[in-house]
């Protein structure tokens, strides 16, 4: 019952309400009383322990990072690289294809990719293409974390 309560608590974290992952918890002591002990009591105890202990663990928000491969005509490479830098992207490589195009490989936070198709089309006069695939999660930068927490709080207050 304690584990079940902890798993349920992990569905809504303390920072912005997002699920908690990579959590390790150890039950050190416990007791059973025939009258007061019930499944709901143990679940509630786990929930209270979770809420008390998690802020002390200094949790951080994680953000999904994806691998971006952009194929653009050579004369648009500078514009696309500048745009990737604005999106907090890290350019990992540039590979000329030999036919007047270059393939840029970068790692970019998924949050920055929402309007990328439209932006790439306007930057390259509809001549650029891209693929984007999830790679891993990374710690969210402090500014982006504060923004996400503020947005989550505003959404919770609106409900």
Predicted regions and their residues:
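Accessory interaction regions appended to the cores of large information-processing enzymes
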Residues: 1-159
């Amino acid at each position: 019952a304690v584990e079940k309560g902890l798993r349920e608590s992990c569905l809504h974290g303390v920072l912005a309400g997002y699920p908690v992952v990579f959590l390790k918890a150890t039950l050190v002591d416990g007791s059973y009383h025939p009258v007061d002990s019930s499944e709901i009591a143990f679940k509630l105890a786990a929930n209270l322990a979770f809420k008390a202990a998690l802020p002390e663990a200094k949790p951080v928000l994680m953000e999904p990072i994806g691998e971006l491969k952009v194929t653009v005509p050579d004369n648009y490479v500078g514009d696309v690289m500048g745009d990737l830098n604005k999106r907090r992207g890290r350019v990992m490589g540039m590979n000329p294809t030999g036919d007047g195009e270059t393939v840029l490989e970068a790692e970019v936070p998924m949050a920055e990719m929402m309007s990328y198709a439209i932006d790439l089309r306007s930057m390259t006069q509809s001549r650029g293409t891209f693929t984007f695939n999830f790679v891993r999660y990374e710690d969210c930068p402090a500014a982006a974390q504060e923004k996400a927490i503020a947005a989550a709080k505003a959404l919770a207050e609106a409900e």
